[in-house]
Amino acid sequence: MHLRILIVICISVSSLTANDYFIRTWEKHHLNPHFWAEGGHAADFNRDGHGDVVVGPYWYAGPNFKKRHTLYSDKDTFEIKKAGKKEKLPGFPGELSRRNGYSNNFLTYTYDFNGDEWPDVLVFGWPGKNTTWYENPQNKPGLWPEHHIFQTSNGESPRPIDMNSDGKPELLLHSGGHLGYVQGDWNAPSKPWKFIRISAKGSWQRYTHGYGAGDVNGDGRVDILAKEGWWEQPAELDGKDWKHHPVQFSKGRGGAQMYAYDVDGDGDNDVITSLDGHGYGLVWFENLGKTESGSFNFKQHIIINREPSESPYGVKFTQIHAIDLVDINGDGLLDILTGKRFWAHGPGKDFEPSAPAVLYWFELTRTPKGVHYIPHLIDDNSGVGTQVAGVDINGDGHTDVVVGNKKGAFAFIQKAKKTTKAQWQLARPKRVKN
């Protein structure tokens, strides 16, 4: 197994209080150079007190991630020509093949599905195909038992989220041209889950971009977001379609995971999204309040876009195909974790496919002059897949990052070092325009 560890020299700086200043570096673990999945996650799978990382068919045992374990079949291979001879490589065509390919694992999450206190692994496979959870065998040898719970999970940004406030996750996805989510029977979580339709039939299909959820109108219920607007969850779930509030959250194909979050701290939730998962644009839509018709007005704010001049820090990159909303610096505000999906459609398609595969976190900052996001570069040779996960892998209280994509599998461990205000100011990202 190939494993590389290095300290990433990209520096993030943040202050938690007037007297606390931190410089943040990232310990980069290149767990595997082979392409197995477009996402990954973390949990303590062997319950030894150390967080582990899962990407594709493998989980890597913490704290050093050197020992690899297989949870489902890793027999997929492909051929390349090297020095005039054919060579067989594990996984799927990606960076090592110098040609494009796709995996059978689009997103990965962890959760204890059967309540035995051992974390299991949830895999959204190829869009439109099976969603499966793999049952942790409690340190017993062999592949993990698999449970296929839904056959046609459409969309490129599904994820688990508690839709009905019962403390357990539903699976946010769409199917058969309808928006909705999938609900399980927690007395029998390995049996097929049921799709809960919330919209009339539309043009949504397996490769639709941009999908999310959150409480948009502040009524305490989780609404559903798509690039065409948001669907209001009613007080009673009676099987009828949810009310659609049209908002153009993307003029193009749509982006990645979408979130409702109070960005500006004014008490109502705004919307965070990318504009095009294969193009440009990371934005937040300010919730301007309720209209006479009962809907809400939104104002778009650009974080980064097509031109460096559209960012106060001169940052731009393409293919924002994965977003996580997580508190990176421990200040209580949720930051944006994202980056460039490496070779979404290979080396010859999309915008700037061969530009550096960057991984960033955007620090949410509220000031008397308003809200802005400060970009902090984590790495410039990894990027994201269709998923990026911010999770405290090693339990030190700092958010770490897991990536799976066509460059392989990565874990980034955050290192926060207390410093002086002068050093903090010197290291802080500099604005190129006011």
Task: Indicate where each model-derived feature is located.
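Sec-dependent N-terminal signal peptides
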Residues: 3-14
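Beta-propeller-forming repeat regions
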Residues: 18-434
